[in-house]
């Protein structure tokens, strides 16, 4: 019998040489009720669990007859499930977002938001899609796809980057038995001045093994530490902007987020924003309540704010959020935080494909005066070696040198290891994926084809601004304007939302994708780019990086200091989104006094204008005895022998009607034009006022 005091489930699992997940599954099968791996069990319960597991193991070792019936039932169930799945067939020229949206019955804007939030893929209305993007969309909505064979007729159109990424997806799906655990990659987030950088520095200074004398003089953007014989990789650039940009580019590197909240300050605006980004990415969150060494620290109050403002319930309060009180300054609680990171990694089964060509994600890139183009990466799969041919975004190269996080030269890098690569022809885009290919020649060919493809798609990459909304044509009756709102205070955000909601109408939906407090950042721009939205800022500035990115991505960013001006601009944009209303205007009347038959022309009416005018570019109705006999266009209009555009009363004129010769003397004519009149939406507030009247 194992002697032990009261302990948590994960600690018991460790003593039994099991993973917490395996133990939880065993306990569930045995009927033992525990909430999570953080639940406590007392000594008596622990010994009962051990006895039950030993008995279960003894039974498992006894030979048993195969349950054929169950297998058949499972096969039948699988067949039924497959039948239930919806399937669509696409032609090669139908790989466009608007066409796919129509085929699967999901609005474009809904697809754009779902793909950005859930899968980190940025799409635009009507965008020509890669096959892999189509598969991701259909996977999200559980729809099978079939592409007609003629797709393969043009090899030139295949995106090699898409095939490289698909290679790893297939490995993960078809060769699960070859996947092995890898060290977790952690991003630290939180409000400014809550201690993100101090925590990263504390972990680095106390845990990085074999630091060279004099310290590390250069950071490569990430580092690895060792805890109880296991490794953890930390991205050394805290903040959710980097995190969001990675997601937007489909190159997410983070496995776990540590959300830092100061015990003396509580949950603040950037805490909420960071949490929303982590939650949207479906990444496990561990909360580190920092600064517990301060006199005014209040851990319990901070936990209460986690519940009230974020919906994060600590495990000790019956929830499933791991909360660790720490002091990054003194080091108190940091070891426990690291242990919790390893525990969460184990529970989430973070794995990789350890063999074959490497795949990595770029976390930093720059042009170094001495070394040339360099890229700091975290290896995701395979082994990256010196001499490998690589491609990334818009460039390629051969790995000339590799440096680890201590800037020491190495020959190979393994999954989750941060390294610096030298050897790219140009500086690769930060946050993009790196792939190893068979040769430098192949790498060059892949990138050249991609650059040609990108150039061809350049025109489709421009986003809308408020003026261009006036020219927008959408495939649906109801139009949608996506908005990202940023303001100086939560009070201002509430006021903006209230004002904007009053502009809702039955013709146009105003969709607030995100609303927050603080300056307009790169993450706001990336989100706006993903949903083809407009950013509206109230009493906030646009940071320089965001301004540059907005120009690059073609995202419209507007800032205001007066709320009514923002509302007026928005009203104008909404009016511009509506197609003009066609209004008929009667401009004159006349009477046919004489009918002339002209060879090769037909019948021409001699008309006396009674009032108003006749317009050559307008329309006419012909009435006989009060009955409408013709409505259509004027083919020709003459005053005497001269072709004219307009004839006014009381003049006479000759008219040839388009496609109609059955005219008689005495027929009455009504002339009219169709004018396009700017249409105004019926806003919610105005509609309510009208109903009251």
Swiss-Prot record:
<feature type="binding site">
    <location>
        <begin position="190"/>
        <end position="197"/>
    </location>
    <ligand>
        <name>GTP</name>
    </ligand>
</feature>
<protein>
    <recommendedName>
        <fullName>Translation initiation factor IF-2</fullName>
    </recommendedName>
</protein>
<dbReference type="GO" id="GO:0005829">
    <property type="term" value="C:cytosol"/>
</dbReference>
<dbReference type="InterPro" id="IPR005225">
    <property type="entry name" value="Small_GTP-bd"/>
</dbReference>
<dbReference type="InterPro" id="IPR000178">
    <property type="entry name" value="TF_IF2_bacterial-like"/>
</dbReference>
<keyword id="KW-0963">Cytoplasm</keyword>
<feature type="region of interest" description="G2">
    <location>
        <begin position="215"/>
        <end position="219"/>
    </location>
</feature>
<feature type="region of interest" description="G3">
    <location>
        <begin position="236"/>
        <end position="239"/>
    </location>
</feature>
<dbReference type="InterPro" id="IPR044145">
    <property type="entry name" value="IF2_II"/>
</dbReference>
<keyword id="KW-0342">GTP-binding</keyword>
<dbReference type="Pfam" id="PF22042">
    <property type="entry name" value="EF-G_D2"/>
</dbReference>
<dbReference type="Pfam" id="PF11987">
    <property type="entry name" value="IF-2"/>
</dbReference>
<feature type="region of interest" description="G1">
    <location>
        <begin position="190"/>
        <end position="197"/>
    </location>
</feature>
<feature type="binding site">
    <location>
        <begin position="290"/>
        <end position="293"/>
    </location>
    <ligand>
        <name>GTP</name>
    </ligand>
</feature>
<comment type="function">
    <text>One of the essential components for the initiation of protein synthesis. Protects formylmethionyl-tRNA from spontaneous hydrolysis and promotes its binding to the 30S ribosomal subunits. Also involved in the hydrolysis of GTP during the formation of the 70S ribosomal complex.</text>
</comment>
<dbReference type="GO" id="GO:0003924">
    <property type="term" value="F:GTPase activity"/>
</dbReference>
<dbReference type="GO" id="GO:0005525">
    <property type="term" value="F:GTP binding"/>
</dbReference>
<dbReference type="InterPro" id="IPR053905">
    <property type="entry name" value="EF-G-like_DII"/>
</dbReference>
<dbReference type="GO" id="GO:0003743">
    <property type="term" value="F:translation initiation factor activity"/>
</dbReference>
<dbReference type="InterPro" id="IPR006847">
    <property type="entry name" value="IF2_N"/>
</dbReference>
<dbReference type="InterPro" id="IPR015760">
    <property type="entry name" value="TIF_IF2"/>
</dbReference>
<feature type="domain" description="tr-type G">
    <location>
        <begin position="181"/>
        <end position="349"/>
    </location>
</feature>
<keyword id="KW-0648">Protein biosynthesis</keyword>
<dbReference type="Pfam" id="PF04760">
    <property type="entry name" value="IF2_N"/>
</dbReference>
<keyword id="KW-0547">Nucleotide-binding</keyword>
<comment type="similarity">
    <text>Belongs to the TRAFAC class translation factor GTPase superfamily. Classic translation factor GTPase family. IF-2 subfamily.</text>
</comment>
<keyword id="KW-0396">Initiation factor</keyword>
<dbReference type="InterPro" id="IPR023115">
    <property type="entry name" value="TIF_IF2_dom3"/>
</dbReference>
<dbReference type="InterPro" id="IPR009000">
    <property type="entry name" value="Transl_B-barrel_sf"/>
</dbReference>
<dbReference type="InterPro" id="IPR000795">
    <property type="entry name" value="T_Tr_GTP-bd_dom"/>
</dbReference>
<dbReference type="Pfam" id="PF00009">
    <property type="entry name" value="GTP_EFTU"/>
</dbReference>
<dbReference type="InterPro" id="IPR036925">
    <property type="entry name" value="TIF_IF2_dom3_sf"/>
</dbReference>
<feature type="region of interest" description="G4">
    <location>
        <begin position="290"/>
        <end position="293"/>
    </location>
</feature>
<dbReference type="InterPro" id="IPR027417">
    <property type="entry name" value="P-loop_NTPase"/>
</dbReference>
<feature type="binding site">
    <location>
        <begin position="236"/>
        <end position="240"/>
    </location>
    <ligand>
        <name>GTP</name>
    </ligand>
</feature>
<feature type="region of interest" description="G5">
    <location>
        <begin position="327"/>
        <end position="329"/>
    </location>
</feature>
């Amino acid at each position: 019998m194992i002697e032990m005091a009261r302990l948590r489930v994960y600690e018991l699992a460790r003593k039994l040489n099991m993973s917490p997940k395996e133990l939880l599954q065993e306990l569930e099968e045995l009927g033992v009720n525990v909430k999570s791996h953080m639940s406590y069990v007392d000594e008596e319960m622990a010994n009962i669990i051990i006895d039950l597991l030993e008995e279960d193991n003894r039974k498992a070792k006894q030979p048993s007859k195969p349950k054929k019936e169950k297998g058949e039932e499972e096969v039948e169930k699988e067949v039924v499930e497959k039948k239930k799945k919806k399937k669509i067939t696409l032609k090669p020229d139908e790989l466009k977002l608007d066409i796919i949206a129509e085929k699967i019955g999901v609005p474009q804007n809904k697809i754009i938001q779902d793909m950005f939030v859930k899968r980190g893929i940025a799409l635009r209305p009507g965008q020509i899609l890669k096959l892999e993007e189509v598969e991701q969309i259909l996977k999200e909505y559980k729809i099978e796809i079939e592409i007609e064979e003629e797709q393969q007729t043009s090899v030139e159109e295949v995106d090699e980057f898409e095939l490289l990424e698909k290679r790893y997806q297939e490995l993960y799906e078809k060769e699960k038995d070859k996947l092995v655990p890898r060290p977790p990659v952690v991003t630290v987030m939180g409000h400014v001045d809550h201690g993100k950088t101090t925590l990263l520095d504390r972990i680095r200074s106390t845990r990085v093994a074999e630091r060279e004398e004099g310290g590390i003089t250069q950071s490569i953007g990430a580092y690895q530490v060792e805890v109880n014989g296991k490794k953890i990789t930390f991205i050394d650039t805290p903040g959710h902007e980097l995190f969001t940009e990675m997601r937007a580019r489909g190159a997410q590197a983070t496995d776990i987020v540590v959300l830092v909240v100061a015990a003396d300050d509580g949950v603040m605006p950037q805490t909420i924003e960071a949490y929303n980004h982590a939650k949207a990415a479906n990444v496990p969150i561990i909360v580190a309540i920092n600064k517990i060494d301060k006199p005014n620290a209040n851990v319990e109050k901070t936990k209460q704010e986690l519940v009230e403002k974020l919906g994060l319930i600590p495990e000790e309060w019956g929830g499933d959020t791991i909360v660790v009180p720490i002091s990054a300054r003194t080091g108190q609680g940091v070891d426990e935080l690291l242990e919790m990171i390893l525990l969460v990694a184990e529970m989430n089964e973070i794995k990789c494909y350890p063999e074959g060509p490497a795949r990595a994600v770029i976390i930093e890139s720059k042009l170094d005066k001495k070394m040339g183009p360099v890229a700091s990466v975290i290896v995701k799969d395979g082994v990256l070696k010196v001499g490998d041919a690589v491609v990334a975004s818009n460039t390629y190269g051969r790995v000339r040198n590799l440096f680890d996080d201590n800037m020491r030269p190495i020959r190979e890098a393994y999954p989750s290891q941060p390294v610096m690569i030298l050897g790219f022809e140009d500086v690769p885009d930060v946050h993009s994926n790196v792939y190893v290919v068979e040769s430098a020649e192949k790498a060059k060919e892949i990138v050249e084809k991609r650059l040609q493809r990108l150039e061809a798609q350049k025109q489709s990459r421009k986003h809308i601004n408020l003026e261009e909304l006036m020219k927008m044509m959408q495939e649906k009756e109801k139009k949608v304007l996506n908005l990202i709102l940023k303001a100086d205070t939560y009070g201002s955000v509430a006021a903006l939302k209230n004002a904007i909601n009053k502009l809702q109408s039955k013709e146009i939906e105003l969709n607030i994708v995100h609303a927050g407090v603080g300056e307009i950042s790169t993450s706001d721009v990336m989100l706006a780019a993903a949903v083809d939205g407009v950013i509206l800022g109230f009493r906030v500035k646009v940071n320089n990086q965001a301004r540059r990115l907005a120009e690059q991505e073609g995202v419209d960013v507007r800032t205001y200091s007066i709320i009514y001006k923002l509302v007026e601009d928005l009203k104008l944009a909404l009016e511009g989104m509506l197609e003009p209303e066609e209004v008929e205007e009667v401009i004159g009347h006349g009477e046919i006094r004489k009918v002339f038959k002209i060879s090769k022309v037909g019948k021409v009416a001699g008309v006396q204008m009674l009032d108003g005018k006749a317009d050559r570019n307008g329309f006419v109705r012909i009435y006989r005895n009060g009955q409408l006999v013709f409505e259509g266009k004027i083919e020709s209009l003459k005053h005497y022998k001269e072709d004219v555009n307009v004839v006014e009363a009381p003049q006479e004129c000759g008219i040839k009607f388009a496609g109609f010769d059955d005219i008689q003397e005495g027929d009455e004519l009504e002339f009219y034009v169709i004018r396009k009149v700017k249409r105004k939406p019926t806003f919610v507030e105005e509609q309510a006022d009208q109903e009251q009247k």
